[in-house]
């Protein structure tokens, strides 16, 4: 999960808030690698979402941090939260029952647009406060 250059970005983001991968539970919305690293189709999300829902039931997190558009849209839809334009979802805190949802950009965004660096690290600065 999050390997190569994207994995390096993930590690840097978590290290910036004094967390490591060992301290967080990470999973994917889509459980298989898609051909050509393409974006997931609606039916693929529908087929895989059962597993994510089950993981959330088992782990019972207090804070969900969806990384990227598809994970964010799925979770906001799943828990009946107001859907705002994608750009407005990033860094916004949503409350759903017993947990919080705090969407952030997908880490690969930094590889495609290095000018997002400060914003992405700033969004991560809130995570330790939200997880208390």
Q: Where are these predicted regions, by residue range?
A:
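A polyanion-binding, active-site-adjacent surface
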Residues: 1-132
């Amino acid at each position: 999960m999050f390997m190569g250059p994207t994995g390096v970005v993930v590690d840097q983001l978590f290290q910036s808030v004094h967390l490591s991968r060992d301290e967080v539970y990470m999973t994917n919305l889509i459980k298989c690698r898609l051909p050509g690293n393409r974006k997931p189709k609606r039916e693929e999300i529908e087929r895989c979402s059962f597993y994510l829902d089950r993981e959330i039931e088992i782990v019972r997190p207090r804070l969900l941090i969806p990384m990227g558009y598809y994970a964010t849209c799925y979770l906001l839809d799943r828990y009946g939260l107001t859907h705002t334009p994608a750009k407005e979802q990033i860094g916004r805190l949503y409350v759903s029952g017993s947990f919080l949802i705090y969407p952030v950009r997908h880490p690969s965004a930094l590889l495609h647009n290095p000018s997002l660096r400060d914003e992405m690290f700033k969004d991560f600065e809130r995570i330790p406060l939200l997880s208390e």
